């Protein structure tokens, strides 16, 4: 399946492709 962008931001970055930091969690671009 596709990434869900649910990880926590680390130093303002997200490691899932197509995701951006919406502190404290990553959201879809």
From Swiss-Prot:
There is a cross-link at residues 1-29 (Cyclopeptide (Gly-Asp)). Signal peptide: none annotated. Coiled coil: none annotated. Disulfide bonds join 5-19, 9-21, 14-26. Belongs to the cyclotide family. Moebuis subfamily. This is a cyclic peptide. Contains 3 disulfide bonds. This is Cyclotide mela-2. GO terms for biological process: defense response; killing of cells of another organism. The presence of a 'disulfide through disulfide knot' structurally defines this protein as a knottin. The keyword Transferase does not apply. Pfam families: Cyclotide. InterPro entries: Cyclotide, Cyclotide_sf. It comes from Melicytus latifolius (Norfolk Island mahoe). The lineage of its organism: Eukaryota, Viridiplantae, Streptophyta, Embryophyta, Tracheophyta. Probably participates in a plant defense mechanism (Potential). Binds to and induces leakage in phospholipd membranes, particularly ones containing 1-palmitoyl-2-oleophosphatidylethanolamine (POPE). In vitro, displays cytotoxicity against cultured cells but no hemolytic activity towards fresh erythrocytes. Not active against Gram-negative bacterium E.coli ATCC 25922 or Gram-positive bacterium S.aureus ATCC 25923 up to a concentration of 64 uM. Keywords: Cytolysis, Disulfide bond, Knottin, Plant defense.
């Amino acid at each position: 399946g596709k990434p869900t962008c649910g990880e926590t931001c680390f130093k303002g970055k997200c490691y899932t492709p197509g995701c951006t930091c919406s502190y404290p969690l990553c959201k879809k671009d």
